Regions:
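A hydrophobic/aromatic-rich effector-binding and dimerization subdomain
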Residues: 2-10, 17-24, 84-124
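Tight coil/turn sites that cap or link beta-strands
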Residues: 37-39, 73-74, 82, 104-106
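Histidine-centered metal-chelating micro-motifs
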Residues: 59-61, 68, 77, 81-90, ...
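Generic protein-terminus/edge-of-domain signal
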Residues: 1-63, 67-70, 76
């Protein structure tokens, strides 16, 4: 599991560079120490992959163009592919850490356009 302390972008874009993810193995797991990131935040970014996360320590504010949500230790969330998002450690928090699972949505839908994809994955 890779420890993340900053977001790396593809040149000229807000698309996150995700080393290690490929068509052969469309999944990566990482441990994000948000309190050790510059500005205690992960800047606005997006990726083609879906993201499932679990808050291990502390709490953070998660932003998308559609709104904000606060996640505390023991809670988690899901961000679908191609969704612009950012997160920041809540004020007054010490350690803020999350476990991230980033994967191609086809891993759970089977194939693009399948009933599982149309009914349960794409609408998220």
């Amino acid at each position: 599991m890779k420890i993340i302390r900053k977001v790396e972008f593809k040149p000229g874009s807000y698309e996150e560079e995700l080393p290690g993810i490929s068509a052969e193995f469309p999944y990566i797991a990482s441990y994000v120490e948000l309190d050790k990131c510059a500005g205690r935040q992960s800047p606005w970014h997006w990726h083609k992959e879906a993201e499932l996360f679990y808050m291990e320590q502390g709490s953070l504010e998660y932003d998308t163009p559609h709104g904000k949500a606060v996640f505390t230790a023991g809670s988690g969330g899901f961000v679908n592919s191609n969704v612009l998002h950012m997160s920041r450690a809540k004020e007054g928090e010490g350690s803020v850490a999350a476990l991230l699972h980033i994967f191609n949505p086809l891993l759970i839908s089977g194939q693009s356009g399948s009933i599982i994809d149309r009914k349960y994955v794409s609408p998220l």
